[in-house]
Each structure stands twice: as C-alpha cells, then as structure tokens.
C-alpha cells in the first residue's frame, strides 16, 4: 500500500519503486495528482523536494516530486501573508548542513511555498533580491513545481537588495489594486547568504538603511491606510557563532545559520525571539523526568550477642 510508505522513503526510493513495480507506482502517483489518493510527505521540508529536481532549468516534470510537494503540510494556514525576497546569486549554490540541498534550494522552495499560500494580489508571487526589486509571478508557468522553479531561476540576480524599494514595491502594489489591509504581507522574509547590514554597496553606488527609515516608511503606509509589514532576515549560510534568532535595534528579526529548527520556525512564521525561546524550552523533550516512586528499603540491623 503506497499510501502507507513513510515520507522520506517516498523521496528516496521512488526510482526503486518504478524499477520493480512501475505500473502500480505510476497509477498511484497519477491518482495522487488527481486528488484521489494521498502520499505521505508530512515530515519532509520544501527544500528537500526542490533539491530533488537538482535545480535544472530543463528538468522534466517528476510526478513523484510534484505529488510530494502538493501534499506538504500547510504550516501557515489561516495566518497572515508572508512574502519572500529570494537571493539568487552564485554564492547561494553552496550546500547546507553537508546535505544535498543548497542555499538556493531553500530560498526558491520557501519563495514558492509562501507564494502559493498567500491570498489576493500577492498569491503566487515573491520578490527578487535586487537594488531594483520586482515581483515575480509564478502563475505564468503551467502550475507545476518544476515550472515554478524554472521561473525562479530565470530571475536570479547578483546584487544587493534595496530594502526601502522592497517596502515601496509592496505599498505601490497595494495602492494600485486598492487592496484591503489584511491582503498585504504581514512579514517580509529575506533569504540570503549575506549578513544583514544597514549599508549595502554595488559597483555603482552605496545604499544605507538609516535607523529612522522604518519611521519614514511606516508613515507612508499609515498615510495609505496600511500597517507596515515586519522584516525578517535569514542568513542561511551563516557560520558565525551567533544565537539562532535575535532582534536588532531597528526591530528586524535576524535568523542565523541553517537547521531544521530554523526551517520550522520560519515555516510557522513565529519569529519573535522570546516566543521562540519559550516554545523551545517547553517542548516535551525538555520536560523534567519524573521517576516512579519507590518504597524505601528496610534496613535490618543484626546485633552480635
């Protein structure tokens, strides 16, 4: 029964299933993609499935990877929109945690994952990591994960990002389309292999993020009737000995380094450092161990005559 196969086995052993049981496996995957059956992908992460395509722009659609992607758990269901700013520069090609996935796989996977779950005007969209950021429309493909990866790869750019321009792009989109406040992203998530810096320079100019910039941008949003999205910056390839998440003096959530805990935190959109700390230390694994009560031993003293 292929519906009982564990998540990771579905990802790793699909070639073996096709080699030894091709007809039944293909029929099962076809039924899954039609919504008639379920495939188990509950313990997989988005980047693991994207990495299965080897990030090849000419990759053919893989029914197994498509089925696993469609059946990923929705960790943000009912929550606010999250829009990703994805770094596609060459340095993002480094592998993460000695695994097969790359930082680029993480960025593209989360950009697609959150874009699919956003509602309204920002559905199926993410933003390029650029000094002239633009909205990428993933719906221009045929709807498959493979086509969305190809679209993302075509928009890779080697540049620093202009954070003010990102906020302005979102506000401009909201005003142009007369969006309701709840249709705007609640969080802007920047995925990169760079350290967060208030100043960024390229070959042409330098751009500095001033401490009062959020006040200026916030006023623009307020004047238009909107709430300013919060900003989170994840340095996926950080090798510094910093704590996993902290908040700087401008209120930006800074996530450092790659781990499954960091992925869980980002997918749940719980980016408040204090909340993350409390959630971590209150998990079952850290609860005190209570040993069963035992009766005290009776000591018998023998006196010599």
Segments the model singles out, each with a brief description of its role:
Residues 1-106, 116-305:
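Long lumenal/extracellular ectodomains of secretory and single-pass membrane proteins
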